[in-house]
């Protein structure tokens, strides 16, 4: 209670409620003048004064304040009085609150105190319960195990109180219980004991409580209160006993415990009966146990005190659970073999006779360290002293009586339990004396050992003085107990005899038998455990641990000797009395005591007769301790149990085999265990190691090392693929780079340029150009390239279609600035961002010039093998082969052994196209190539035009000239090029493109470096110009469609007028499909090569010099325009940086190369096809308008339009210029001031957005086949469409065929008059022109039929064009796009004009002129061409500049539907348009677009696509005239508020699928006339300029046609009432006459009302 009082002392202080004086203000009067002022601030005042008078009081309740304030407010007249009262009340309230708070705190503290007490009480109870639990276990070793395991935490907590466990446990009657438990007990006995152990637990709890009370009383006397809750008396006595010697302490404890002996004896008797019945090892031991039980409390207290003292001296923290276990074992029942082992140990250590020290103490001391042994001995000595004194204090008779009573009680249980022991009883009787002798010897040795242990224990040296006496007493008591027990109860004697005899006999018989040793050890352990008190049990555990740790068998030998000697008198007899099974069960006790076979060996030397003999036998049997160690029970009690018994320090002792051996359990079968004390660490590979990444490379894609473009040498990577990719890119660039001179190409082929294509894994595609000027031998390069390409092409090809956009996006941005130019010195890298549609194409300008020649049969030399094939022997001897197959990793390969020649092998497989249906469609279109490749004559063009495969949606666009020896560009057929389409299920497209490239400019490296990399950023488009600043020989313009965001993220984009660049740029628009892009790029490359070859076919040798020459040098404008499906929206193209490192990002370079190669092939394919289909696509001139609009969307360059103009004029001058359109690629070669400027306009449009177009294109193909069967109606349809674009379209038609979807035609102009290629182009163009004129004539004859064929659902491929103004135009012009569309489609009357030599003029005139209603009625039939032309003109206008909606005042946004895909006007018309759609895949979608979306530079640009398309048609003059007229007409349309965005949809190719271009045109005829006039006027000068460039004749014709068209357009616009109606026109080629008729009938008034300017039709 002192604690409680102490705890209440501060509480009392708190409870001192004194009047607060600190802030108390004494008022002189209730009415204080100051109060008045204070009351002014009533609320604040109340708070202030409340605080003022508050002294550490809780906050006032608001209610009180409110009451006070209300009270004051109610008595305002008597403020001062109320204030005083309020203050008083507030003070009282604060006082009350304070008192409450104090009380609350006191209550809380009391509750906490009570709770702590309860917790402590529960802890003690738990301790007792655990002790009882473990001591009450049927098996001592199990008890030990449980103790060790479950009591670990508890033990540690108890160990924190070092002295308490000793005191409490010593005072506990555990020694008796241990003595009792020392008797071997069967499982049945254990159960009985467990039943009785509950009583013992209760007894222990009572004792503990009593001891706790004593401890509380004597808390001051004791260094630390025992954890056991003793009564105050017990605790006081224990504290006194601590000061008293161990004997006196034991006596006092005995006296104290004797008070409770009655109860204890009852429990102890039960326990002893159980223990005697269980142990039945000897009445002597049971007597000792009874004595211990009688003195259990005293012994516990004394032993605990002694142990506490010993612990104080030895500083051993004893686990209460451990102590409790032996105590509880003693009290509960020594049933558990843990008792046997523990009590045996404890008894040996704690035995009253001093035998206690014999076993456990000896074990601990000898085994572990002398200190620990001495400590254990001291504990045992203390325990022995206490126990001994207790036993002496308790008369032996009393103890014997108690034991007898317990034995008599336990005999019943033992009889049942010892049914098996009956056999042993005889032996026990016979060997009783022997066991006693052995016990005596063991006792003597134990005494000696205990003495040694005590002597070893410096802390308990004083006790060691008493030890001999104690030992004597212990021996005597043990002997007495042993003999007396044997004499007292015959049954117990019989049991002891039985146990002792069989144990001894077995041990003797098993001197050499390990099992006997184990049995002996078990019995010894059981004896030790049973005899040892709780503290002794713990000490035994400690000793075991020490022994195990020390691994010294001497100590366990001593322990066993002591234990066995002790057992000889007590436990020994019990052990002997135990059956072999019991002894086996006791084996873990041996183990627990740390007595292993080795230990037993050591024990053997120390053990007395029987025990020693047993130990000797065991040791003899176990010559090698390891063998015994190997034989270890599965139980893991050994060290852990021991450690649990011992100090925590001992717990962590070595993992010795001894420990493992000591873990042997009696019941647990022995298992051979390696004698090595340490755990064997088996290091095995991870389960996944064998299947690690190395092994899972097949299952998992190999990690691709990321090559950062920021690396000093991004090409340095662990992968050899990079080098191979370098070679691949090198060869590719060598084949593709037209911008380089032959020397440059040679230099590139020599290895100057190296590229590294990386897979989608994130490897940056790197284009590396070594600075080496050394030219690699053809063979070496071919080999290197072959190897490199073969290895890398597969991955690259697989990824090129997918990766390039993503690869080029972000990394390229930084790589532009970061990559060292030294790696890219050969070629300036332009920062090209990848399109989401994977349409990024950067075409290197190295060898494209020479490699663009495709469609040559020389390419046949390049086998159309898988991408693995890389080397092709070119005619020039150069081994160049580009193998592109997305299927295989080696699909794309390019090697240029010879600088002059490069072969491109392009192979596309269906698997490659699985990702993109549009690609598949395109490839299906490519199937036409086979036929096309086979045919060589120009008739092949006609055939392709007439015989497009229906299955090929855009095959007409891709229809490569069937073996045409003449280049579609007008170039003489490249000798080394071949574009072949393989009709393989796997291989949809395979094209071998080889072009002899004279790479003679070995200074190309520096030249390229000198070449200015100019990037023109235009709305989602990037144009790159590589121009040799030194010689300007090579000018490469690369236009890449990029995301605007990417543009913003990329390097600075200096504003540059598109007009500056379009002159030199090649628009290359690609479809969303990667393969299509690659095909387009490849075709573009091939086209570029073809153009360069066509321009310098014979000048290959001259190219090196001619290109070196400023005049003869060919500026290669490679305008690669990457268009994504998202970019289709018409937006003003932002001028891109005039200069940017062309391939600052090698990724872009590679992507450009690969994609460019593929697309060049595709473009070449479609280019040739378009040449063949060009006439049929003349109907697609309307699509050209859409394409022109796409051009506006994708390029701002008016140069393209100027080039187109010049091309058209030059094409009109068939001697100078030739334009070919393939799959949206128009290649023009024209002389430009003696400079070979090659412009490749490739405009693959994005797919996906218009899948309808593919179907429409298929229908177009079918219709084209029909048209191919019936050319006349086709020609008529062509005439109708070629009114606007026939020549232009014939010039550019194939271009727009590729341009249909969104493909920008590629114009290749060769301006060198001396250039043979240019002459060839002119020749070809002239042929094409003648052919187109012939087609025009045919179209005159069978215009309606052709229109019926022209109106094909293939045109419906762009469903956006839903209504055509004229059914004969086979185009569905939806009113949604234009409220008013002035379709200046010339009537057949105008077609007659077109029949004139100036078909272009007629087309332009028709475009510009508006037919009469009848004419319009007919023109609507012919509408597709005129509409295409007009749309083309609008595109020209848009290229020139954005046509603001104000520019089209006559075309306000129509109230009518603007549905891109819907057919608001009439599905029948659309159907007819689709049905009548000619084979030309071009589909023109007219959508109302905001002027912002339409890039317009009206004065500067004419839609390059229009011009290109016109260039495609041989009638360049018509193109020019038409374009001029369109421009003038567009000028008329400029007033329209809504700019007209027209996309040319190539029905054939999904990539060419036209993206719906909303065109907002006001229906007002006059208004349209005006804008059309303005537009025409603006376009006229540009077209005139172009025509002037082309030829004055063409200019004159164009001017004439322009004037005619202007007047006609005005008429048409006047006649057409748009009434603010927007029309969407989908014009398809090959419209059927019937459908045309239907459209006439259905739309004649509409068309009349909808008479749109041809520019509007654009």
Swiss-Prot record:
Residues 36-76, 156-499, 550-584, 589-608, 770-819, 863-964, 1082-1115, 1197-1216, 1261-1315, 1334-1482, 1503-1658 are annotated as: Disordered. It is found in: Nucleus. One of its GO terms (biological process) is subtelomeric heterochromatin formation. Residues 1607-1626 have a biased composition (Basic residues). Residues 262-286, 568-577, 800-812, 879-905, 1082-1096, 1197-1207, 1463-1479, 1648-1658 have a biased composition (Polar residues). InterPro entries: Leu-rich_rpt. The modification Phosphothreonine is found at residue 500. GO terms for cellular component: chromosome, telomeric region; nuclear periphery. Residues 36-54, 335-352, 386-397, 425-435, 442-461, 471-482, 869-878, 918-931, 1097-1115, 1261-1272, 1335-1366, 1507-1537, 1550-1564, 1575-1591 have a biased composition (Basic and acidic residues). Residues 205-214, 245-254, 289-305, 365-375, 398-407, 932-956, 1407-1423 have a biased composition (Acidic residues). Involved in the clustering of telomeres at the nuclear periphery, forming discrete subcompartments that accumulate a complex of histone-binding silencing factors like SIR4. Required for SIR4-mediated anchoring and partitioning of plasmids. Interacts with SIR4. This is Silent chromatin protein ESC1. The lineage of its organism: Eukaryota, Fungi, Dikarya, Ascomycota, Saccharomycotina.
């Amino acid at each position: 209670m002192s604690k409680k009082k102490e705890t209440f002392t501060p509480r009392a202080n708190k409870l001192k409620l004194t009047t607060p004086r600190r802030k108390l203000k004494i008022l002189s009067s209730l009415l204080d003048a100051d109060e008045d002022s204070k009351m002014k601030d009533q609320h604040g005042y109340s708070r202030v004064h409340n605080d003022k008078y508050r002294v550490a009081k809780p906050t006032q309740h608001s209610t009180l304040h409110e009451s006070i304030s209300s009270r004051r407010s109610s008595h305002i007249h008597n403020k001062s009085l109320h204030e005083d009262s309020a203050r008083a009340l507030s003070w009282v309230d604060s006082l009350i609150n304070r008192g409450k708070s104090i009380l609350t705190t006191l209550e809380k503290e009391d509750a906490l105190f009570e709770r702590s007490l309860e917790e402590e009480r529960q802890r003690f109870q738990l301790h007792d319960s655990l002790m009882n639990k473990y001591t009450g276990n049927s098996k001592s070793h199990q008890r030990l195990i449980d103790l060790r395991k479950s009591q670990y935490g508890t033990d540690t907590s108890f160990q924190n109180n070092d002295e308490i466990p000793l005191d409490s446990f010593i005072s506990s009657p555990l020694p008796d219980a241990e003595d009792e438990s020392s008797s071997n007990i069967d499982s049945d006995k254990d159960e009985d004991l467990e039943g009785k152990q509950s009583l013992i637990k209760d007894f222990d709890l009572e004792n503990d409580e009593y001891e706790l009370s004593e401890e509380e009383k004597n808390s001051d006397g004791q260094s630390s209160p025992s954890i056991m809750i003793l009564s105050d008396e017990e605790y006081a006595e224990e504290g006194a006993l601590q000061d008293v010697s161990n004997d006196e302490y034991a006596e006092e404890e005995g006296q104290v415990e004797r008070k409770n002996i009655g109860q204890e004896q009852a429990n102890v008797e039960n326990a002893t009966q159980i223990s005697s019945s269980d142990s039945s090892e000897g009445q002597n031991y049971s007597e000792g146990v009874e004595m211990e039980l009688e003195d259990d409390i005293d012994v516990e207290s004394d032993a605990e005190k002694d142990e506490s003292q010993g612990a104080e001296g030895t500083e051993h923290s004893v686990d209460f659970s451990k102590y409790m276990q032996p105590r509880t074992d003693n009290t509960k029942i020594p049933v558990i073999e843990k008792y046997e082992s523990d009590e045996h140990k404890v008894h040996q250590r704690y035995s009253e006779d001093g035998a206690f020290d014999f076993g456990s103490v000896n074990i601990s001391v000898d085994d572990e360290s002398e200190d620990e042994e001495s400590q254990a001995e001291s504990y045992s000595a203390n325990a022995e002293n206490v126990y001994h004194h207790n036993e002496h204090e308790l008369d032996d008779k009393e103890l014997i009586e108690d034991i007898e009573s317990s034995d008599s009680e336990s005999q019943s249980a033992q009889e049942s339990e010892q049914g098996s022991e009956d056999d042993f009883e005889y032996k026990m009787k016979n060997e009783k004396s022997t066991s006693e002798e052995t016990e005596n010897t063991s006792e003597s040795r134990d005494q000696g050992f205990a003495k040694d242990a005590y002597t070893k224990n410096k802390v308990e040296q004083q006790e060691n003085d008493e030890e001999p006496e104690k030992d004597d007493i212990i021996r005597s008591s043990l002997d007495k107990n042993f003999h007396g027990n044997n004499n007292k109860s015959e049954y117990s004697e019989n049991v002891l005899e039985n146990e002792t005899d069989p144990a001894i006999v077995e041990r003797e018989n098993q001197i050499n038998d390990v099992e006997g040793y184990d049995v002996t050890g078990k019995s010894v352990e059981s004896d030790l455990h049973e005899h040892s008190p709780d503290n002794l049990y713990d000490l035994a555990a400690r000793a075991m641990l020490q022994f195990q740790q020390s691994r010294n068998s001497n100590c366990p030998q001593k322990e066993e000797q002591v234990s066995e000697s002790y057992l000889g008198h007590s436990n020994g007899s019990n052990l002997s009395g135990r059956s072999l099974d019991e002894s086996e069960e006791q084996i873990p006790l041996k183990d627990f005591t740390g007595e292993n076979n080795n230990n037993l060996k050591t024990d053997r030397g120390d053990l007395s007769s029987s025990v020693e003999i047993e130990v000797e036998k065991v040791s003899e049997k176990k010559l090698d301790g390891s063998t015994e160690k190997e034989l270890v029970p599965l139980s893991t009690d050994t060290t852990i149990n021991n450690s649990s018994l011992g100090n925590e320090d001992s717990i962590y002792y070595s993992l010795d085999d001894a420990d493992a051996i000591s873990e042997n359990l009696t019941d647990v079968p022995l298992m051979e265990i390696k004698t090595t004390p340490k755990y064997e660490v088996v290091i095995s590979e991870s389960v996944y190691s064998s299947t690690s990444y190395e092994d899972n490379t097949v299952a998992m894609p190999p990690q691709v090392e990321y090559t950062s473009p920021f690396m000093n040498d991004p090409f340095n990577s662990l992968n050899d693929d990079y080098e191979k990719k370098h070679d691949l890119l090198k060869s590719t660039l060598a084949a593709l780079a037209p911008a380089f001179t032959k020397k440059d190409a040679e230099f590139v082929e020599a290895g100057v340029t190296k590229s590294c294509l990386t897979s989608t894994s994130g490897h940056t595609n790197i284009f590396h150009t070594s600075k080496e000027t050394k030219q690699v031998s053809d063979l070496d390069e071919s080999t290197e390239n072959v190897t490199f390409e073969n290895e890398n092409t597969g991955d690259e090809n697989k990824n090129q279609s997918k990766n390039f956009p993503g690869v080029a996006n972000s990394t390229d941005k930084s790589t532009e600035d970061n990559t060292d130019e030294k790696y890219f010195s050969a070629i300036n890298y332009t920062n090209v961002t990848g399109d989401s549609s994977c349409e990024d194409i950067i075409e290197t300008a190295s060898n494209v010039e020479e490699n663009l020649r495709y469609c040559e049969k020389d390419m046949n030399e390049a086998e159309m093998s898988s991408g693995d094939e890389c080397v092709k022997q070119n005619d020039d001897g150069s081994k160049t082969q580009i193998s592109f197959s997305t299927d295989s990793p080696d699909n794309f390969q390019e090697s240029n052994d010879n600088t002059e020649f490069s072969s491109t092998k392009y192979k596309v497989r269906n698997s490659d196209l699985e990702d993109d249906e549009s690609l598949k469609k395109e490839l299906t279109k490519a199937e036409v190539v086979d036929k096309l490749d086979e045919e060589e004559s120009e008739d092949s063009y006609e055939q392709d035009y007439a015989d497009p495969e229906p299955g090929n949606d855009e095959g007409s666009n891709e229809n490569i000239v069937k073996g045409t020896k003449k280049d579609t560009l007008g170039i003489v057929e490249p000798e080394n090029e071949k574009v072949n389409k393989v009709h393989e299920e796997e291989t949809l497209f395979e094209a071998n493109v080889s072009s002899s490239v004279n790479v003679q400019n070995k200074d190309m490296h520096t030249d390229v470096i000198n070449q200015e990399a100019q990037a023109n950023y235009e709305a989602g488009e990037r144009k790159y110009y590589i121009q040799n600043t030194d010689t300007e020989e090579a000018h490469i313009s690369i236009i890449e469609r990029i995301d605007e965001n990417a543009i913003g993220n990329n390097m600075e984009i200096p504003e540059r007028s598109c007009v500056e660049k379009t002159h030199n740029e090649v628009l290359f628009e690609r479809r969303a499909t990667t393969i299509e892009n690659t095909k387009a790029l490849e075709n573009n490359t091939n086209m570029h090569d073809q153009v360069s070859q066509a321009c310098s076919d014979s000048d290959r040798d001259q190219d090196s010099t001619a290109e070196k020459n400023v005049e003869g040098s060919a500026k290669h404008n490679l305008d690669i325009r990457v268009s994504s499906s998202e970019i289709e929206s018409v937006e003003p193209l932002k001028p891109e940086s005039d200069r940017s490192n062309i391939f600052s990002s090698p990724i872009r370079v590679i992507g450009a190369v690969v994609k460019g190669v593929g697309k060049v092939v595709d473009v070449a394919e479609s280019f040739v096809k378009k040449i063949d289909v060009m006439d049929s696509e003349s109907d697609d001139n309307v699509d050209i308008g859409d394409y022109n609009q796409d051009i506006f969307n994708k390029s701002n360059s008016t140069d393209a339009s100027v080039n187109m103009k010049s091309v058209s004029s030059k094409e009109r001058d068939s001697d100078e210029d030739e334009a070919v359109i393939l799959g949206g690629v128009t290649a023009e070669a024209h002389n430009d001031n003696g400079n070979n400027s090659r412009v490749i306009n490739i405009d693959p449009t994005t797919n996906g957005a218009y899948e309808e177009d593919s179907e429409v294109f298929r229908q177009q193909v079918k219709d084209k086949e029909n048209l191919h069967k019936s050319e006349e109606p086709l020609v008529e349809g062509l005439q109708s469409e070629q009114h606007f674009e026939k020549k232009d379209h014939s010039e550019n038609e194939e271009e727009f065929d590729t341009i249909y979807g969104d493909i920008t035609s590629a114009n290749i102009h060769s301006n060198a008059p001396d250039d043979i290629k240019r002459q060839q182009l002119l020749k070809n163009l002239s042929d094409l022109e003648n052919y187109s004129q012939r087609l025009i004539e045919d179209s005159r004859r069978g215009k309606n039929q052709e229109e019926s064929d022209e109106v094909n659902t293939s045109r419906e491929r762009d469903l956006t064009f839903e209504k055509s103004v004229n059914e004969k135009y086979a185009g569905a012009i939806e009113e949604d796009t234009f409220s008013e569309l002035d379709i200046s489609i010339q009537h057949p009357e105008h077609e007659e004009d077109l029949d004139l030599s100036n078909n272009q003029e007629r087309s332009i005139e028709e475009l510009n002129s508006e037919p009469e209603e009848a004419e319009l009625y007919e023109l609507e039939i012919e509408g597709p061409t005129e509409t295409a032309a007009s749309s083309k003109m609008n595109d020209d206008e848009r290229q020139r500049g954005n046509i603001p909606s104000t520019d089209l005042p006559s075309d306000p946004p129509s109230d009518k539907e603007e549905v891109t895909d819907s057919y608001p006007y009439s599905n029948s018309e659309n159907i007819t348009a689709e049905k009548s759609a000619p084979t030309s895949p071009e589909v023109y979608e007219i959508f109302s677009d905001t002027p912002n979306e339409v890039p317009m530079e009206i004065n500067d640009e004419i839609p390059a696509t229009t011009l290109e398309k016109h260039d495609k048609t041989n009638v360049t003059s018509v193109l020019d005239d038409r374009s001029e007229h369109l421009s003038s007409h567009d000028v008329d349309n400029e007033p329209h508020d809504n700019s007209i965005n027209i996309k040319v949809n190539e029905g054939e190719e999904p990539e060419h699928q036209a993206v719906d271009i909303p065109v907002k045109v006001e229906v007002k005829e006059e208004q349209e006339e005006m804008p059309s006039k303005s537009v025409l006027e603006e376009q006229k000068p540009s077209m005139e300029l172009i025509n002037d460039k082309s030829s004055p004749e063409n200019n004159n014709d164009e001017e004439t046609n322009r004037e005619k068209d202007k007047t006609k357009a005005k008429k048409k616009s006047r006649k057409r009432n748009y009434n603010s109606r927007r029309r969407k026109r989908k014009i398809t080629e090959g419209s059927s006459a019937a459908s045309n008729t239907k459209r006439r009938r259905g739309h004649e008034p509409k068309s009349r009302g909808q008479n749109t300017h041809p520019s509007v039709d654009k």
